[in-house]
Amino acid sequence: MIVKTLTSLGHAIIDSIWRLGVASSFIAKVLTRSSIVLRRPRLLVDEIHFAGVLSMVIIVVSGLFVGLVLGLQGYETLKRYGSTGAVGTLVALSLVRELGPVVSALLFASRAGSAITAEIGIMKTTEQLSAMEMMAVDPHARVISPMFWGGFISMPLLAAIFSAFGILGGYLITVVVIGVDGGAFWAQMQASVDFYHDILNGVIKSVVFGFAVSSIAVFEGYSAVPTAEGVSRAVTRTVVTSALAVLALDFVLTAFMFTGGV
């Protein structure tokens, strides 16, 4: 029993390492075919619209409600200590450091990442990618690379929008509804949030998350089994793997950015 369990675990580890190597080789190939996005920027613009603009609604609404909850919870906590003016700092730091990049990346993986995987998988199932190869059109350059870069560019922008609307939500619930002094809200935020230590590190996080989610989405779509069930499984793997990757990367980046390493 123990031997069988260890054997299965070993096979799973070896398979994961092999799949990671295949994925790395695939992404390297996609990156080497990226010149097409400069020669034909329309392809990139279309993919930014597909991955970014069409994700705006869920990002804006989610960011607003997260900000409302943060403001309400922060106010109730700080009220006990007579520091309600610092609620702006709590909301802003929570969003720009953590919740903005992480939650927007999870939402991006669920909405855009799954859609990218499904589109590539369906193109593979209907043999559109094979038809491109027969016509001497490289699908990595024509299809995969623009999708990858569209997701990669969209992710940091969506994270910034999420944080902005989150701060707006925090302002609305604490200043407009509850009655916290608006001047103290903004003054405390401006005094406590540092551009390089807080905002820039949050942007770096969102860039890393964008690379990870976009890489996983295009790889899972291209490697999907060309059947309806295969595409469905690939979409599921994209969402699950992206979520785990984002959370793991968030821990690593936070450890080095804000604590100097563990």
Residue ranges and their predicted role:
Residues 50, 58, 62, 84-116, ...:
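Loop-to-helix entry region at the N-terminal start of transmembrane alpha-helices
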Residues 120-145, 228-231:
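Short cytoplasmic-facing helical segments at TM-TM junctions of multi-pass membrane proteins
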Residues 235-253, 257-262:
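Helical hairpin unit composed of two closely spaced alpha helices linked by a short loop
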